[in-house]
């Protein structure tokens, strides 16, 4: 069971509804349920794996941090084929890696892990937020 420390104050249903209005999209149910339980924070884990690799993981963003992050990323800082409005950044690794939920129609709800160095490179992906949550390797 995933347990987080250093979480922000709990969010209300109204907070989440306002965030979805801001996005213009409904979040996946698994993500809503997660954020009702934990508003950001750090899990005590070794990492998170996809079908092939184990990736480092640091922390989940709070709802407010996710809202702010919508202005932090521009198209040039994203993997090829993505625009800034296509991804909801919700977590990060200890370096320059980002975890983001796709907001695009063609792959809505899919989770991507990419690293931004000279250019953004995709390294990991999960079919859903629920699948992502079930892929953590605990310490």
Describe the residue ranges of each PLM region:
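Generic detector of low-complexity/intrinsically disordered segments
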Residues: 4-6, 56, 103, 118, ...
């Amino acid at each position: 069971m995933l347990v987080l420390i250093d979480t922000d104050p709990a969010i209300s249903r109204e907070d989440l509804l306002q965030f979805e209005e801001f996005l213009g999209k409904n979040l996946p149910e698994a993500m809503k349920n997660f954020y009702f339980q934990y508003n950001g924070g750090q899990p005590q884990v070794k990492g998170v794996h996809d079908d092939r690799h184990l990736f480092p993981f640091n922390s989940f963003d709070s709802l407010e941090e996710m809202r702010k992050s919508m202005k932090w990323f521009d198209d040039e800082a994203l993997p090829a084929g993505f625009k800034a409005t296509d991804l909801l950044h919700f977590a990060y690794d200890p370096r320059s890696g980002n975890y983001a939920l796709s907001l695009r129609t063609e792959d809505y709800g899919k989770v991507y892990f990419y690293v931004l160095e000279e250019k953004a490179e995709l390294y990991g992906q999960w079919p859903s937020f629920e699948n992502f949550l079930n892929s953590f390797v605990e310490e």
